[in-house]
Amino acid sequence: IIPDIKIKGALVQLGDLKINRDNWDNKFIDENPFWCPDRDSIKSWKKKINSLIDEGDSCGAVIEIIAKNVPVGLGAPIYGKLDSDLGSAIMSINAVKGFEIGNGFDAASLKGSENSDEMRIKNNKPTFISNNSGGILGGISSGQDIIVRFAVKPTSSIRKERKTIDKSQNETAISTTGRHDPCVGIR
């Protein structure tokens, strides 16, 4: 739609294993099976996946998407908010159970003075000092990078036996055989 916009996604958390953001390398994302930006995380992530396969279990994941060169003014302050539209689209993806923009849920533990995005004039233009809002203020794009993250649940279709009931309400157990995704967030 807008040719200058560049969108890139990466897996930033596999189960309880998070990347080290200081090691972020955009080029490395396409070079590994996890779409991970942190080269140092790969060994532990492989070990985690192999362990889950052996156990017949699964884990969740967090994916981060960054959109660069988004123009100022997309969205609306009341109806048609950009953050609402993005949330609706992302939450429509199977297995997604959480969505955040910018500081997201971490903002709940911050003060307003810590979370707000202050501005200054740089090269005769208004410039943000931070991007805690993830590039969206009041439902409208601010011109900064739009940063969103979403959480994908662990799949319940696992080999590991789980308690359930049958159609006659008898207690029983279930185990899924065949294809087993240890983490659907990698897909």
Outline where the language-model segments fall.
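Buried hydrophobic packing segments
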Residues: 1, 148-149, 187
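Glycine-rich, mobile lid/loop segments that gate access to catalytic sites or pores
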Residues: 1-78
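A structural-propensity feature for long, helix-poor, extended segments
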Residues: 9, 18-22, 28-32, 39-40, ...
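Glycine-rich anion/phosphate-binding loop at the beta-strand->alpha-helix junction
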Residues: 56-59, 63-171
